[in-house]
């Protein structure tokens, strides 16, 4: 069995809790079928390194016209699992970012949280008026929209203290997302973030799709240079 540190396990659980995990008397995850391998990877990590009962199940969502299948993992909420749940769940049964976020200090947890709740944008963009192809440097957002702004500030402080990552809070101003707040990494901070988490991102199709703009950024940048007749590095 590969050894992992306590920091890795703790940050993995915190990243999962703040992400897509709903924790009641049992831990529970639910994702679409395209993320089945990711669910299984999480379940395997919990079984291996926490010794908790955890299984991957499958169910059909009858509300979807295309008969989408959903897979989710359940594991008994005992020992450390219960402790970490209590860190971030209030008596009202809702998740909150608390001062315990200071323990979110390993890149594995950050990678998991972005896989759960993040998005990565950037890459080649064509201007159809001029026909020119432009390269937009990748940026990352974490969509922690369920948390109030004052709790997101605590999260920002933890990122700065533990990872030396500087972020901004950006409010959305359109449609159904109006007023929701994203944690935003600018282009420079996104590169620092990627250098930090890349060794900890699982080798899964889902993860490669999530971080695609970062994975192929060198290829894209060189393509634009060739189009413009620039010298390549």
Please provide the spans of the model-predicted regions.
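Internal intein/HINT superfamily modules and their associated LAGLIDADG
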Residues: 1-233
């Amino acid at each position: 069995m590969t050894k992992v540190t306590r920091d890795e396990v703790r940050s993995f659980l915190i990243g999962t809790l703040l992400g897509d995990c709903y924790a009641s008397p049992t831990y529970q995850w639910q994702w679409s079928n395209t993320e089945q391998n990711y669910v299984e990877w999480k379940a395997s990590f919990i079984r291996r390194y926490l010794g908790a009962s955890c299984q991957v199940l499958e169910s059909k969502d009858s509300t979807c016209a295309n008969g989408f299948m959903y897979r989710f993992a359940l594991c008994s909420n005992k020992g450390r699992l219960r402790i970490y749940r209590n860190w971030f769940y209030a008596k009202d049964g809702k998740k909150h970012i608390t001062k315990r976020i200071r323990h979110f200090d390993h890149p594995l947890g950050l990678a998991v949280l972005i896989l759960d709740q993040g998005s990565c944008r950037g890459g080649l963009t064509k201007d159809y008026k001029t026909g020119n192809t432009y390269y937009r440097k990748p940026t990352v957002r974490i969509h922690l929209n369920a948390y109030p702004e004052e709790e997101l500030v605590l999260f920002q402080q933890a990122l700065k203290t533990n990872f030396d990552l500087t972020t901004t809070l950006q409010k959305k101003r359109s449609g159904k997302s109006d007023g929701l707040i994203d944690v935003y990494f600018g282009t420079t901070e996104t590169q620092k973030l990627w250098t930090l988490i890349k060794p900890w991102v699982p080798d899964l199709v889902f993860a490669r799709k999530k971080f695609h703009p970062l994975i192929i950024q060198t290829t894209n940048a060189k393509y634009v240079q060739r189009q413009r007749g620039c010298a390549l590095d």
